[in-house]
């Protein structure tokens, strides 16, 4: 299903969370933490269920390099809520880890 709903939430100056999801079932989503450095937005962490509605991936990035995902299984709404909560509650640590790996 195409992701036809998008929200951009600015968490702090230069830090944004983008939430994309499909309207129809099965729900497909992507939740991405982005940070702006020197005028360019960089993906720091991404959560999605691109392979299966019940299979959820958390991708770390080392610089621009996407790392192998952490994979969990479960309900879409639970996974989306957990991803949003993880970003909202831990974005500064996630960004700091990404910056240290650059």
Task: Please identify what each model-predicted range represents.
Residues 61-102:
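Acidic, low-complexity intrinsically disordered segments
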Residues 15-18, 32-35, 44, 50, ...:
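Extended aliphatic helical segments
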Residues 5-7, 21, 37, 45, ...:
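Arginine residue identity/basic-tract feature
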Residues 18-19, 37, 51, 80-81, ...:
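Alpha-helical interaction segments
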Residues 1-38, 42:
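Negatively charged, low-complexity tracts enriched in Asp/Glu with abundant Ser/Thr
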Residues 28-68:
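A short, structured beta-strand/loop element
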């Amino acid at each position: 299903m195409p992701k036809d709903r998008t929200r951009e939430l600015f968490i702090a100056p230069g830090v944004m969370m983008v939430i994309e999801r499909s309207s129809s079932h099965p729900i497909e989503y992507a939740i991405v933490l982005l940070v702006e450095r020197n005028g360019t937005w960089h993906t720091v962490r991404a959560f999605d269920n691109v392979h299966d509605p019940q299979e959820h991936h958390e991708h770390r990035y080392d610089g621009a390099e996407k790392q192998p995902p952490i994979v969990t299984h479960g309900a879409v709404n639970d996974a989306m809520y957990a991803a949003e909560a993880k970003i909202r509650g831990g974005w500064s640590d996630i960004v700091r880890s990404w910056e240290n790996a650059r």
